Amino acid sequence: MEKLQVFSPLEAVDLRCVRGERTLFQGLSFTLRGGELLRIGGANGSGKTSLLRIVCGLLEPDRGEVRWGGESIRRLKEEFWARMIYIGHANALKDDMSAAENLGVACALAGIVADERQIAAALARLGLSGRENPPVRALSQGQRRRAALARLALGAAVPLWVLDEPFTALDAAAVEDVQSLIRGHVSRGGGVLYTTHHEASIGAAVSRRIDLAGT
């Protein structure tokens, strides 16, 4: 397993997000440090996905900023992105490519070095042994979600994981597989920011929740 890169504090400072005439959240500040798990809660439409996209630098806040190690992520850009894995609620898989091919491309784009054996092992870790090679269009929704999440099995060295509804479409065994990966990452000093409607406890030592309702 690769050594974890240094985790610099992730800070959200006075964030405000507006959609149309509606303010989703405002005055939102928090800090995520290595070894911590932070769940973002709130009702549908409260801005959970927008917040994660802001944290990743994929969406500009209407006010405030996100910092990594005290520096604005807008200035750091690629340097910050190289230290993060973001898995959105959409799987972002190419239907005409296999799970193995999709994972290989995702790793290459993220700068994660992984050979065919490691890719196969990562997919097996998520319960896709024997399903590595069919095109993704032939997989069930749960299998597609597992294929997307297999990046986590190869991302032990990447300090920050940002996960939007990672347990969607997963059966109980797959949920436990993903929870185990998250627990392991946090125990090694990584940080995880995530949303979920799944109520089972991940069981990390340092776990917090921020609810967007009323911000």
Regions of interest found by a model, annotated:
Residues 56:
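Helix-to-loop junction immediately C-terminal to a conserved catalytic motif
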Residues 64-75, 79-80:
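Conserved ABC transporter NBD signature motif
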